[in-house]
Amino acid sequence: MNECVNKLLHLKFLFYFILGIQKRPVFFVASRYGRSTTYDESLKSRRIFIVPRNEHFFLGSRYGKRSGKYLCLSREINKLIVRKRLRNNDKERTPTLSFITKHFLMRNT
């Protein structure tokens, strides 16, 4: 039984080590906002786990937050804005030679 538990613990350690999810050391913050405090107050300070959050960075996200359903919506809105600008630019653009030629040929056929 003891041997089984040891094997299980060893496998669990290897699993977490391979995945890179092993526990990291804890960083102790002596005072809040970097202000100087007495020793008793610094003991009351909370401990902070400093862990790199690389899994939270995705393309198209802001400030390392996960990209949710709103990312697709914003992309669609951006596409619509670009299309609208292109249509407006076509209307405001002065006719070029190819534009005039196409309309001339279409009128004569």
Swiss-Prot record:
Which compartments is it annotated to reside in?
Secreted
Question: Quick one: signal sequence residues?
Answer: 1-22
A GO molecular function annotation here is: receptor ligand activity
- In terms of one coarse class, where is the protein primarily found? secreted
Tell me the GO BP annotations in alphabetical order: G protein-coupled receptor signaling pathway; negative regulation of feeding behavior; neuropeptide signaling pathway
Give Gene Ontology CC terms: extracellular region; extracellular space
Q: Which domain of life is it from?
A: Eukaryota
Q: Which residues carry this modification: Tyrosine amide?
A: 33, 63
Q: Which residues form the propeptide?
A: 36-53, 67-109
Q: What does this protein do?
A: Neuropeptides RYamide-1 and RYamide-2 are ligands for the G-protein coupled receptor RYa-R. May suppress feeding behavior.
The name of this protein is: RYamide neuropeptides
